[in-house]
């Protein structure tokens, strides 16, 4: 994605871009067998994202009032609760835990603003490392010095929000949310050559 969120929102509002087309672009990047999608995402919502995008496109054609960012896909770190989804925190230990009963506040607000969640991103297990490696779900690699013929070669993406950062750097989502206590958003952003923000 080479557009800002503001630009994408304007394109959607004017009809020069459709939500379904945006979602399909993201899914194609995620599903690319030569890309980092399989190591950057723990779960991808193919059908749900498409259905939500179609609903946004339909509503826009009807002239209905929509939130500012309606139809823009985003990824979320596997540390945030989402109603009906298991929050694994990048660990196999929690894969059979009970699904979350509600959305995390930040996620609820992003959905209310119109974002479409396209999937949950890989992360350092329990957010406990700055490298971004994960023995269970693979190591998402930063965009620099990758070897497309050998997934064991390449630089780490930084952690703990590794998959979130790579989802942006590789065009798998135009927006993401990570978390940051001691650099878990800022470090992967720096490693991947993008911008990460930790609000104070």
Please place each PLM-identified region on the residue numbering.
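An N-terminal boundary/leader segment
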Residues: 1-51
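Short acidic-aromatic low-complexity motifs
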Residues: 15-16, 63, 77
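Long amphipathic alpha-helix in the N-terminal Rossmann-like dinucleotide-binding domain
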Residues: 47-54, 114-115, 124
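Conserved hydrophobic/aromatic pocket- or pore-lining residues that grip, position, or stack substrates
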Residues: 49, 71, 77, 110, ...
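Immediate post-signal peptide segment of exported/extracytoplasmic ligand-binding proteins
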Residues: 56-73
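Enzymes and membrane/adaptor proteins characterized by extended Gly/Ser/Thr/Asp/Glu-rich
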Residues: 68-106
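Short glycine/serine-rich loop segments
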Residues: 102-200
């Amino acid at each position: 994605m080479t557009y800002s969120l503001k630009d994408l929102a304007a394109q959607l509002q004017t009809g020069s871009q459709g939500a379904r087309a945006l979602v399909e672009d993201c899914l194609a990047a995620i599903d690319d067998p030569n890309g980092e999608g399989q190591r950057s995402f723990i779960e991808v919502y193919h059908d749900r994202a498409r259905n939500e995008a179609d609903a946004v496109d339909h509503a826009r054609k009807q002239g209905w009032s929509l939130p500012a960012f309606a139809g823009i896909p985003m990824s979320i770190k596997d540390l945030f609760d989402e109603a009906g989804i298991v929050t694994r925190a990048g660990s196999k230990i929690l894969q059979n835990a009970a699904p979350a009963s509600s959305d995390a506040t930040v996620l609820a607000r992003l959905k209310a603003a119109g974002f479409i969640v396209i999937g949950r991103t890989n992360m350092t297990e329990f957010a406990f490392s700055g490298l971004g490696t994960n023995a269970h779900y693979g190591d998402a690699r930063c965009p620099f010095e990758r070897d497309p013929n050998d997934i064991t070669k390449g630089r780490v993406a930084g952690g703990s929000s590794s998959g979130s950062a790579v989802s942006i750097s590789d065009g798998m989502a135009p927006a993401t949310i990570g978390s940051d206590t001691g650099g878990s958003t800022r470090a992967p952003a720096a490693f991947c050559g993008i911008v990460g923000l930790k609000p104070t």
